[in-house]
From Swiss-Prot:
Zn(2+) binds at E173, H239, H256. NAD(+) binds at residues 60-65, 94-98, 118-119, 131, 140, 158-161. This is 3-dehydroquinate synthase. SUPFAM superfamilies: Dehydroquinate synthase-like (SSF56796). It comes from the Bacteria. Pathway: Metabolic intermediate biosynthesis; chorismate biosynthesis; chorismate from D-erythrose 4-phosphate and phosphoenolpyruvate: step 2/7. InterPro entries: Dehydroquinate_synthase (IPR050071), DHQ_synth_AroB (IPR016037), DHQ_synth_fam (IPR030963), DHQS/DOIS_N (IPR030960), DHQS_C (IPR056179). It is found in: Cytoplasm. Its EC number is 4.2.3.4. The gene is aroB.
Length: 351
């Protein structure tokens, strides 16, 4: 199956379960991590033909997605003597996708790159759309670029080696999209047999359906708003809270999807307090998240510090915090005129 991301410039295709032989008349630089390399690199190498193939592995995890690791990647690219015709392949989860795309975008002012995601989260979200970047002490993804891949290959067979926790984290991003754009997808999610899914014993068909539906939805959003000036901001539902949680826990306590799950619950509580979302719909999201074993609570130790951290969010402007909310489920919107008192009151409910 193929889904085309129809951008005015740099259009590309997402191939779902269609990874066949890839031929390059250039050098290829594969960026991955030790775990994925051990599990799947042999399979990938059997499908690539190129002038030369270089392999680099870096530690995986949000705590390593920083400028220090980026410098390490760039040094390996220079040591490999890549030129502007070379191709970088990001082979891993969302962290590898973000860093690989960023490295490709700044190496010699830009070389081609391909995403081959190996986690559900990367398949449904991170690998498509052209967002690249790294974290720093001030927050998440504050250093980066918009740089589209030349192609994306999502292979559901790679997902079979994921843990219960990793699969659930990917589902959080899928739930996010449904809550923002299409509540019928929430009905689809509710019907999934979570036991077989989370134990990765189901047929590839379920993964394929999830990936296809999410990519079709996200591609339509990116086509309308590639640089995140309006509609695409809705894909940050739950992320305003999640990024603060991740930063405050040094990116070690939660997987990104887990933090997003908590962030959605917090965003819904804010919407509920403002009279924009009813209690039944707020509970529906909680129930779906719990169905997949995702966390729905976080203890805020210092409400004022948490509030101030919002202002490092990329969606904040003119000293206002733009929150992405659902009202009702399936219809997201951005609200930037919420008083400090209302925000603080919601945060206090999580102390």
């Amino acid at each position: 199956m193929q889904v085309e991301v129809k951008l005015k410039e740099n259009a590309y295709k997402v191939y779902i379960d269609e990874l066949e032989e890839l031929e390059f008349d250039s050098k290829v630089f594969i960026l991955s991590n030790p775990k994925i390399s051990g599990l799947h690199l042999k399979t990938l190498l059997s499908k690539i033909k190129a002038k030369e193939i270089f392999i680099a592995t870096v530690k995986d995890g949000e705590e390593y997605k920083n400028l220090s690791t980026m410098e390490e990647i760039l040094n390996q690219m220079f040591n490999s003597k890549l030129d502007r015709k070379s191709v970088l392949i990001s082979f891993g989860g969302g962290v590898i996708s973000d860093m690989g795309g960023f490295a490709a975008s700044i190496y010699q002012r830009g070389i081609d790159f391909i995403n081959i995601p190996t986690t559900l989260l990367a398949c449904v979200d991170a690998a498509v759309g052209g967002k690249t970047g790294v974290n720093n002490n001030f927050g998440k993804n504050l250093i980066g670029t918009f740089y589209q891949p030349k192609a994306v290959y999502c292979e559901s067979s790679f997902l079979k080696t994921l843990s219960f926790r990793e699969l659930a984290a990917g589902m959080a991003e899928f739930i996010k999209m449904a809550a923002m754009f299409d509540d019928s997808i929430l009905d689809f999610i509710e019907k999934i047999d979570e036991k077989s899914f989370l134990n990765a014993t189901c047929e590839n068909e379920i993964f394929t359906q999830i990936i296809a539906r999410s990519i079709e939805l996200k591609s339509r959003v990116v086509e309308q708003d590639e640089k995140e000036s309006g509609l695409r901001m809705l894909l940050n539902y739950g992320h305003t809270f999640a990024h603060v949680i991740e930063n405050f826990t040094d990116y070690k306590l939660y997987l990104h999807g887990e933090a997003v799950a908590i962030g959605m619950v917090m965003a819904n509580q804010l919407a509920l307090n403002l009279g924009l979302l009813d209690k039944m719909q707020s509970q529906k999201i909680k129930d779906i998240l719990l169905k997949f074993g995702l966390p729905i609570s976080y203890k805020i130790n210092n409400v004022d510090e948490f509030y101030e951290a919002f202002f490092m969010d990329k969606k904040s402007s003119n000293k206002k915090i733009n929150f992405v909310l659902a009202s009702p489920l399936g219809k997201g919107f951005i609200k930037g005129d919420i008083s400090k008192e209302d925000i603080i009151a919601t945060l206090r409910e999580f102390q």
